[in-house]
């Protein structure tokens, strides 16, 4: 994925005319995700009643005259959209509406992502990289993978890079250290308010993150809730959910997956647990990860103190509940 003489990389984006898809597509076309020498073909997948909006997005992509954009295609059929695809950003999901119970939301989206999994299984590239952004992202990724038995489970991931970036930014605001000098941050668990942003293993301007965690009031009353509930704060401030920052997190995630994480650093990725850190095998849980040779590897051997253990366990318990709710619907 590094030469302009190579065949274009085919990238499918679901919910492509939505706010996150719109924010992501132009940066992907400009080379921010796969590199500035890698041509891309973009496949925009939308619901039939949103195809017209997707046509408008394609007009804008054409008008950008991006040198790396080899082509754009619009689909309302996931099987056609995912045929031969190399990267799939599964952004489209049903939002929670007034009066909808969480179980109803889980069920509605599980059906959507079961369909996506089947379509990917039918014809995606053998080494496809799948990133689920649509919420509840962890469990949606679990469902999609379950319906794609011919694709290795480790090719399915869910987005916690947005949360990771939020944790880095919150630490930068508190410490006065630039984000470029903050490394080894970790998000554990679910992409939900139960997530656990872990600064204990981070390096902040050459200092141990544990030094900052020693300020327990900041840690428990500011840092953790600010990161975990940042999405809600953004909705309250702008009247709409995170879009540009979510798109940026997705681009960062795929960029690291393709090109590798920086030496001495790691990032946060929700992927199927192999049983690491006591997390049930198969649960799609966020871990500290490095990208090596195009594959994610969980960072092993970190010391988990009792404070962290309790918070990781709480988020994992929520993931179990989500899994069991979807399984009860016959979708796992």
Swiss-Prot record:
Pfam families given in the database record? Ldh_1_C, Ldh_1_N
Give the signal peptide range. Answer: none
Question: What Enzyme Commission number does this protein have?
Answer: 1.1.1.37
Instruction: Summarize where substrate binds, as residue positions.
Output: 96, 102, 135, 166
Which GO biological process annotations does it have?
A: malate metabolic process; tricarboxylic acid cycle
Chain positions recorded as NAD(+) binding sites: 15-21, 109, 133-135
Database matches in CDD domains:
MDH_chloroplast-like
Q: Does the keyword Glycosyltransferase apply?
A: no
Enzymatic reactions: (S)-malate + NAD(+) = oxaloacetate + NADH + H(+)
* Annotated function: Catalyzes the reversible oxidation of malate to oxaloacetate.
> Which family is it part of?
Belongs to the LDH/MDH superfamily. MDH type 2 family.
Keyword set, alphabetical order: NAD, Oxidoreductase, Tricarboxylic acid cycle
Q: What is this protein called?
A: Malate dehydrogenase
- The enzyme's first-digit EC class, named in words, is oxidoreductase
Tell me if NAD is a UniProt keyword of this record.
yes
User: What is the organism of origin for this protein?
Assistant: Mycolicibacterium vanbaalenii (strain DSM 7251 / JCM 13017 / BCRC 16820 / KCTC 9966 / NRRL B-24157 / PYR-1)
Q: Which GO terms describe its molecular function?
A: L-malate dehydrogenase (NAD+) activity
Where's the active site on this chain? 191
SUPFAM superfamilies, per this entry?
LDH C-terminal domain-like, NAD(P)-binding Rossmann-fold domains
